Amino acid sequence: MKYIYLSTLMFALSALLFTGCDNADYKANGNSLYLSDAAGTSKSSTVTLTENGVDINVVIRLANKMAEDVEVEVGYAPELVAAFNESNGTEYEAIPADKLPQGMTATIPAGEISTIFQLHIDNFATNGVTYVVPFSLGNVVKGSVEKSSAMSHFFYVLSKPLNVSVPVMQPYGYNEKVESDPDKKWGAAVDTYTLEAWVRMSNFNVNNQAIFNVQANNELYIRFGDANGPYNYLQVKAHGDGGTDTDRDWNPNQWYHVAIVYNGSELIIYRDGKRIAGKQVPAPKGGMVIDGLQMVSSGSMYFTAECAMSQVRLWNYARSEAEIQNNMYYEVNPKNANLIGLWPLDEGKGKIFKDATGKGRDMEAQRDIILRWEPNVTFGKKE
């Protein structure tokens, strides 16, 4: 019996000893430091860069409270941006280092679970580039805790939503249109392509209201309405195909983002970033060589609507759905090597639509096709 009592006592003392050790070490061994935003499924969020800049409130927290202050370096990881773009179909660039504060730390006081680090970024000219802040936790300089490797990075995308002047156009004469110089052939040979723009039509009263006619050795003709009404649908005729049609559900006086994508076998129509139609079409005979572009091109007999347009982009490859969705509300970098042409259509006056790529593929609005310019047009995300 004495042996049993002695064994029991020794076991109890051992348990007490180990429990005491666990309590002493718990805050260090069972704890971690991480970014609250990185704890969710999304690894990025969008913040708006205004004239006054932007304040980003970054929550840095512990899994468990500590009995001592915890201090951690805060910094940036631009080397992670390329992999992020690859995974998400984005074209972001890391914000220049001189736009960010350097050598900063954040402290979670003893007994607290978190702290807010406020990062202020002054407004700056983005020139068509969408920048991202690759926020990152650095070394823990005070406190017995380690940072979470999986949740120590987060991407804050700096958005400057489009706010532009747009031309409202309607053909005055039978052959009046907007077009690039027919005497300057582009000679852009492509295997796949994407044409995208913001478009608003005042009516769908007649057929064959052609918003685009690509000048090439193979047909690419984009219009609202064919022979059979009602005509509130988009049709794309490509490479001798009879046409790819959307549903008849387009509304007058509503802005739509339209993207036409040929991926080498299928012609796909996207509206507001979502696929709404698509089918197999013949391959371009002799390959596709694009030499020019026309807009609002079917003449006054057919084109009776007032058509507003903005941000016309022609690419030499098939853009993914993610790429379309992630870039349609913002400017794109005019230096992107995959652009055949980029026409923001935001001059606010005149008859020349400049090609922002610098390739010189400007377009001219003939005669009186521009009825007016509308200022301060924005394209915000639809909830």
Annotate the PLM regions.
Residues 68-81, 115-141:
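Contiguous beta-strand segments of beta-sheet-rich domains
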Residues 192-203, 303-327, 340-349:
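Extracellular, beta-strand-rich glycan-interacting domains
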Residues 150-172, 330-383:
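Extracytoplasmic low-complexity segments
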Residues 162-233, 319-323:
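Extracellular glycan-recognition modules
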Residues 1-5, 11-52, 149-160, 383:
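Bacterial Sec-dependent N-terminal signal peptides
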Residues 159-170, 200-204, 223-282, 372-383:
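Extracellular glycan-interaction surfaces
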Residues 51, 181-195, 247-254, 302-308, ...:
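Extracellular/lumenal carbohydrate-interaction signature centered on repeated Trp-anchored short motifs
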Residues 279-308, 334-338:
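Flexible glycan-contacting loops in extracellular carbohydrate-active proteins
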